[in-house]
Amino acid sequence: MTKKICIAIDGPAAAGKSTVAKIVAKKLRFVYIDTGAMYRAVTYIALKNNVAYEDEMAIDALLKKTVIRFEPGEVQQVFVNEENVTDVIRSLEVTNHVSIVAAHPAIREALQERQQVFATEGGIVMDGRDIGTAVLPNAELKIFLLASVEERAERRYKENMAKGFAGDLNQLKKEIEERDHLDYTREHSPLKKANDAIEVDTTSMSIDEVANKILSLAEQKIQN
């Protein structure tokens, strides 16, 4: 029987966290928890209800009435109160404002509690900005992914084109730099590498190379 460890993968926007985490979870037959999708879902409910992204109390009130759940599949489905929001939470409107919503302490605290419940049984791969430091500080394996702004903008540009979104590469670079600033400098649970996390610079690596490196590290933890 495979030992059910918890794997935390953190890093800045477009560092490849979600793609790699999905591959690792599938290979290990673990559950993948996309915490970024949870923050995007909250941003979407603010948008849908015409609530200002800066209005922490109003968004928190909405969140208290909101059920966010995941449904496994070839592409993991995300539901908000039984509405399938898998695609809409990746819209440019949500993408450009999720860091504002994610900076609210009340929202981070509420979602961190939900994320910790998901992890109680182990056998999970969770990616985000503060998994190794705040959500799963006792995770058996912590990874911190890095990549240059140029590399991350190029990846996001290709993703957007594949989804049919028009994109401007220079604008994407600017947006990623702004998002980095918000993520690294927010007061509550900022993006930072846990002391015991293993840093992986993915700038010159393929997705499979990154996934295989993490799988190798995971196997060592599982066998210990």
From Swiss-Prot:
| An example molecular function term from Gene Ontology annotations | ATP binding
Note the superkingdom of the native organism. Answer: Bacteria
Q: Which reaction does it catalyse?
A: CMP + ATP = CDP + ADP; dCMP + ATP = dCDP + ADP
Give the record's GO biological process terms. Answer: nucleobase-containing small molecule interconversion; pyrimidine nucleotide metabolic process
- Enzyme Commission number(s) of this protein: 2.7.4.25
What GO cellular component term, any one, is given?
cytosol
* Cytoplasm recorded as keyword: yes
Record-annotated residues binding ATP? Answer: 11-19
Which of UniProt's keywords are assigned here? ATP-binding, Cytoplasm, Kinase, Nucleotide-binding, Transferase
Where is it localised?
Cytoplasm
Kinase as UniProt keyword: yes
Chief localization: cytoplasm
Similarity comment: Belongs to the cytidylate kinase family. Type 1 subfamily.
Q: Which HAMAP family match?
A: Cytidyl_kinase_type1 (MF_00238)
Record-given protein name: Cytidylate kinase
Task: State the organism of origin.
Answer: Listeria innocua serovar 6a (strain ATCC BAA-680 / CLIP 11262)
**Source organism lineage?**
Bacteria, Bacillati, Bacillota, Bacilli, Bacillales
Gene that this polypeptide is encoded by: cmk
